From Swiss-Prot:
Origin species: Wolinella succinogenes (strain ATCC 29543 / DSM 1740 / CCUG 13145 / JCM 31913 / LMG 7466 / NCTC 11488 / FDC 602W)
Name of encoding gene: rpsK
Protein name stated in the entry: Small ribosomal subunit protein uS11
Keywords linked to the UniProt accession: Ribonucleoprotein, Ribosomal protein, RNA-binding, rRNA-binding
One GO term (biological process): translation
Family assignment from sequence similarity: Belongs to the universal ribosomal protein uS11 family.
Protein purpose: Located on the platform of the 30S subunit, it bridges several disparate RNA helices of the 16S rRNA. Forms part of the Shine-Dalgarno cleft in the 70S ribosome.
GO cellular component, one term: ribosome
Gene Ontology MF annotations: rRNA binding; structural constituent of ribosome
């Protein structure tokens, strides 16, 4: 009889962190939400695609709202009570994601910052779409 492989499962260590930063990256195709502590260490994350939204539904404002709510529920397990918000990208889920943070109980928003990178006339942009 063959021996069984013994695998060590990674345990999720519950941290007790009161303050954090939520990074919302809203692209044209998806919305990614990452919650870190103030040093930048990742506590939890969520994306619209990971929640089961497929194709063009990932880029909707509703999918962005669900991704934020899922990430905040995970962060509350680690003791997060106060969040700063960093938003990046031109996606359609930006405003909805930020508004949904204000309606979640037990979370206080400390500050808001838009960190979308803007070129100082760098690379040439892609050609305009003609629909």
């Amino acid at each position: 009889m063959a021996k069984r492989k013994v695998t060590n499962k990674k345990r999720v260590v519950k941290k007790n962190i009161a303050r954090g930063i939520i990074h919302i990256a809203a692209t044209f195709n998806n919305t990614s939400v990452t919650i870190t502590d103030e040093m930048g260490n990742v506590i939890c994350w969520s994306t619209a695609g990971a929640l089961g939204f497929k194709g063009s539904k990932k880029s909707t404002p509703y999918a962005a709202q669900q991704a934020v709510e899922d990430a905040v529920v995970k962060a509350k397990e680690h003791g997060i009570k106060e969040l700063g918000i960093k938003v990046q990208g031109p996606g359609s889920g930006r405003e909805t994601a930020v508004k949904s943070l204000g309606s979640i109980e037990g979370i206080k928003v400390l500050w808001f910052k838009d960190v979308t990178p803007l070129p100082h006339n760098g690379c040439r942009p892609p050609k305009r779409r003609r629909v």
